[in-house]
Amino acid sequence: MNDDLPILPPGFGPGSHGEEERPDCPSMPRAMRRFERPALPEPGQLSGHPIALALLERLQEALGAYRIGEQSRVIGLDRQPKADLKLLQQILGEGEVAIQVGGQRPARIQETVLAGVWWVQLQIGRGEVVGQWLEVADVPALVRRRAFAETRWPQLGELPDGLLNAGPVLVELLDAAKRHAERALATPHAVNLSLLPFSPEDRRFLAERLGEGSVTLLSRGYGNCRIASTATPGIWCVQYFNSSDRLILDTLEVTGIPQVACAAQEDIDDSAERLREIREALE
């Protein structure tokens, strides 16, 4: 993946939607991610690039070995020839999910066309790549590690005038989040703001109290789904948009990471088969 690759689409990330499109969330039906084979290079193009082929073989082994719930499988890409990485990037293509991780050492992450195979880049300055790797996982370990690395528990304080439901919603979320912090909840606790009377003041109040986290994820698997961590431990904002970018479902979810962000075991198994087909086509 070269340094100039525009992984994340315009308008992606915290603050990219208006105030009227702030927090909400319930679960959507789970389906396998779609596979669209990228435009593959001609077999002759790979003849002088054995490293690219070797990396594909290692990726095949990682997909065959990985099981959901286990430690992710990582294939380092640092110090590999740029030409081989460019070919690898062409072969793996871009999948449905893009992730942006903020903080002192930001990262950009793109799922490949193989669900559960992620291209991770660490950056400094104006996007200079200082480390990168392929990772086979339901979601990259960096996302879990950094989502709530810098958080705080908000104080309720005195409620401002003009609120309809934000006060009770915040109390409910904080109660669930504290239980989750003590012992991970067996099932996510979700609050669907789309079903509640909510004023602009409600939305501003929740946004200010919960704060803005360091992880933002965009999935094109079900139209557009935008997932963002808040600055409050365990609380995620999950929003669904239609093809016109209109907010159609707005939720807040207490969980380790929303399930819609994660590849399933069937996705991993399917990706192993797809990669096998790709490698055969390149022979």
Swiss-Prot record:
Domain of life: Bacteria
Segments of this protein annotated with the region Disordered: 1-29
Gene3D superfamilies the UniProt entry points to: HupH hydrogenase expression protein, C-terminal domain
Gene behind the chain: hoxQ
Similarity comment text for this entry: Belongs to the HupH/HyaF family.
Organism whose genome encodes this protein: Azotobacter vinelandii
Name of this protein: Hydrogenase expression/formation protein HoxQ
Annotated InterPro entries: HupH_C_sf (IPR038527), HupH_Hydgase_express_prot_C (IPR006894)
